[in-house]
A protein has these predicted regions:
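Short, low-complexity, intrinsically disordered N-terminal peptides in bacterial proteins
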Residues: 1-7, 224-229
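Local sequence-structure signature of Cys/Sec-based thiol-disulfide redox active-site neighborhoods
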Residues: 4-29
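Structural alpha/beta surface segment adjacent to cysteine/selenocysteine redox centers
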Residues: 23-112, 183-191, 195-199, 204-207
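C-terminal cap of thioredoxin/glutaredoxin-like
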Residues: 28-32, 106-229
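Short beta->alpha junction loops/turns
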Residues: 18, 81, 129-132
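A structural signal for the main folded, soluble domain(s) of proteins
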Residues: 14-15, 61, 99, 224
Length: 229
């Protein structure tokens, strides 16, 4: 049964804080929420795990992982409040993708936790609790196993159909945000529609690189992207 494009009031949003594309999409979906009373459930997806290189440790086997560690903090915060997880993703996303900072570093993370009025022990408590690994891994495994996820952002609609994207920069605001939301809902209403994609020209790639400069300066990892299905 097709879902009406007009009656979507809740989505699951899968993200990895490392991903600049997911951050832009999160800004857009927050704007949709502001204008449309949309409810967002934040879920975790690990680019470090999905793109794991043979011979490397899984992110849950490392003392610190660039995306996994902040998501463990998010999982701990989400237990008490989805809005606190929301604020955490907003803070760490802004730090990395706008300010060019490294929110996976303890001092930066503790500063950001203070900004969102999280418990002062959140970093230490979350990382001392091995079940935060389990929660991040459960979200990731669900995205891969149930929705064939290969990257982020992923939107999951009430119909339980997943969509990769929209991949957009900059995040549209105001009426433009609502126009894109209508497109996303319409896309979801066609069960046989699997992909719409704009090829990136050299000019497009230069534009994207300029938009992502803070992230490119701050990151300490090499991007790895496996082929998509």
């Amino acid at each position: 049964m097709k879902e009406s494009p007009v009656d979507i009031q809740h989505i699951d949003f899968y993200f990895d804080p490392m991903c600049p594309w997911a951050y832009q999409t999160s800004l857009w979906i927050r704007e949709v929420r502001r204008l449309n009373d949309l409810e967002i459930s934040w879920k975790f997806f690990s680019l470090e795990e999905i793109n794991l290189v043979d011979g490397k440790k899984h992110p849950w086997e490392r003392d610190l992982s660039y995306g996994w560690t902040p998501m463990r903090i998010g999982a701990w915060l989400r237990r008490s409040s989805m809005s606190m997880c929301d604020d955490w993703y907003g803070a760490i996303g802004r730090a990395l993708h706008v300010d060019g900072r490294r929110p996976y570093e303890r001092d930066v993370a503790i500063e950001l936790l203070g900004q969102i009025h999280a418990p002062p022990t959140a970093w230490d408590d979350a990382l001392a609790d091995p079940t935060t690994h389990d929660e991040v891994r459960a979200d990731h495994d669900r995205a891969v196993g149930q929705y064939a996820g290969f990257g982020v952002p992923i939107l999951v609609f009430p119909s339980n159909r997943a969509m990769f994207g929209p991949v957009v920069v900059p995040a549209p605001m105001g009426d433009e945000a609502l126009k894109l939301w209508e497109l996303a809902k319409a896309y979801n209403s066609f069960p046989g529609l699997f992909e719409i994609k704009t090829p990136k020209t050299g000019h497009d790639r230069d534009y994207i690189a300029a938009a992502f400069t803070p992230y490119l300066v701050a990151r300490q990892w090499k991007s790895v992207q496996n082929s998509t299905p």
